[in-house]
């Protein structure tokens, strides 16, 4: 996608905030535990390579991604740390993963038997076995299949049994009932293994923040890197998470609309008195949700309502008085003591903060501050 460097809209990513969030979490961990930075989905929209570098600087000892392509991109950028692909990879790429020293997630024995002929003992494939303890997504549910896979990995020099893990569905909720059920299922399955792999891990950001007693020796730290609360506003984190992303723009146009004039597609907003309306060059093609009509942005410390439907490339706001083109607009971030968070946007849109940042498209340039890394 073409990046819009010749318009005012920018995503400003704070390297210092990312480093601080990672360091704060590492300080809470057992000395024997490692933190792998989850940088999938273009670093939750913040930029894969820059975020990987910042987290590496802060003490992350490895990375988690969703797909093999993300892992290969990290390798091509020169990262030598361990990389775990959390999703299931097509078995035909097993040899490539082994060659690039990328660890893969496996959830059934058949995958291993199909992969084995492609592999060599000189370049063994590192494997983490996924356990489905209640997420209903991927992994072994019963001990028989788990132990069959573990035995194959242990006895075949073409594999390295590197890890076993699960993922919790409700670690960010107040009611611990289902979480505790998953913990119990995980321990019962792992306890059947005659020999444990190097990594036994369960903790995403939410688990590590609110259920640290469950931490294994590897933490998959994700949304916390970016300063977002995985529970939204349901639970308070044990330390202040520093938001790493600001979405800013400028007024591209400002005009006085007379009483009775309407704004945007569908004419869903009609001014009831003469009003100053500003246009901001950002829209749903940039990942700013179309449903945010009625939400607000910040101009000069004022909350300004988004009026009319959000367009593909532009949106309109009601101004308290005249402002010239070029006036700063904060869509997410701070202005004169007031703020709009990604969670605020998500709550209005009926979704979660992760989806908001992941949804910002490449058309919005990412600008990095507090670091000398240039995209």
Swiss-Prot record:
One Pfam family here: Ala_racemase_C
Record field: catalytic activity: L-alanine = D-alanine
GO MF assignments: alanine racemase activity; pyridoxal phosphate binding
Keyword Cytoplasm: no
Pathway: Amino-acid biosynthesis; D-alanine biosynthesis; D-alanine from L-alanine: step 1/1
GO CC, alphabetical: cytosol
InterPro entries according to UniProt: Ala_racemase, Ala_racemase/Decarboxylase_C, Ala_racemase_C, Ala_racemase_N, Ala_racemase_pyridoxalP-BS, PLP-binding_barrel
Top-level taxon of the source organism: Bacteria
A biological process from GO: D-alanine biosynthetic process
Residues at which substrate binds: 137, 312
Enzyme Commission code(s) on record: 5.1.1.1
Cofactor: pyridoxal 5'-phosphate
Active-site residue list: 40 (proton acceptor), 265 (proton acceptor)
Modified residues (N6-(pyridoxal phosphate)lysine): 40
Keywords: Isomerase, Pyridoxal phosphate
Primary enzyme class: isomerase
Family: Belongs to the alanine racemase family.
Matches recorded under PANTHER family: ALANINE RACEMASE (PTHR30511), ALANINE RACEMASE, CATABOLIC-RELATED (PTHR30511:SF0)
Function, as annotated: Catalyzes the interconversion of L-alanine and D-alanine.
The protein's name: Alanine racemase
Natural source organism: Limosilactobacillus reuteri
Gene from which the chain derives: alr
């Amino acid at each position: 996608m073409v990046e819009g460097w010749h318009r005012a809209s920018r995503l400003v990513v704070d390297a210092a905030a990312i480093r601080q969030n990672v360091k704060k979490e590492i300080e809470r961990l057992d000395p024997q535990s490692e933190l792998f930075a989850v940088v999938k989905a273009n670093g939750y929209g913040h930029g894969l390579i820059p975020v990987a570098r910042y987290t590496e600087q802060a003490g992350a000892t490895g990375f988690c991604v969703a797909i093999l392509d993300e892992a290969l991109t990290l390798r091509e950028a020169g990262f030598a740390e361990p990389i775990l692909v959390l999703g299931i990879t097509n078995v035909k790429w097993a040899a490539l993963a082994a060659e690039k020293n990328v660890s893969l997630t496996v959830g059934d024995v058949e995958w291993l038997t199909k992969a084995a002929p492609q592999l060599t003992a000189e370049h063994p494939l590192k494997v983490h076995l996924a356990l489905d303890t209640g997420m209903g997504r991927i992994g072994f549910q019963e001990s028989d299949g788990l132990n069959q896979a573990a035995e194959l990995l242990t006895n075949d020099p073409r594999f390295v049994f590197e890890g076993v893990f699960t993922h919790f569905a409700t670690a960010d909720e107040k009611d611990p009932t289902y979480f505790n059920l998953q913990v119990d299922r995980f321990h019962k399955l792992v306890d059947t293994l005659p020999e444990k792999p190097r990594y036994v891990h369960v903790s995403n950001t939410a688990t590590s923040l609110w259920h640290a007693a469950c931490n294994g020796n590897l933490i998959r730290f994700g949304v916390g890197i970016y300063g977002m609360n995985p529970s939204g506003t349901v639970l308070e984190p044990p330390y202040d998470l520093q938001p790493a992303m600001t979405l800013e723009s400028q007024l591209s146009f400002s005009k006085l609309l007379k009483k009775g004039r309407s704004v945007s597609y569908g004419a869903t907003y009609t001014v009831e008195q003469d009003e100053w309306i500003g246009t901001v060059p950002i829209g749903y093609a940039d990942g700013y949700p179309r449903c945010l009509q009625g939400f607000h942005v910040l101009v000069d410390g004022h909350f300004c309502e988004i009026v009319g439907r959000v367009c593909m490339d532009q949106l309109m706001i009601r101004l308290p008085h005249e402002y010239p083109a070029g006036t700063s607009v904060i869509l997410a971030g701070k202005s004169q003591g007031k703020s709009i968070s990604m969670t605020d946007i998500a709550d209005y849109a009926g979704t979660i903060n992760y989806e908001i940042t992941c949804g910002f498209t490449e058309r919005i340039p990412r600008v990095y501050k507090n670091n000398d890394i240039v995209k």
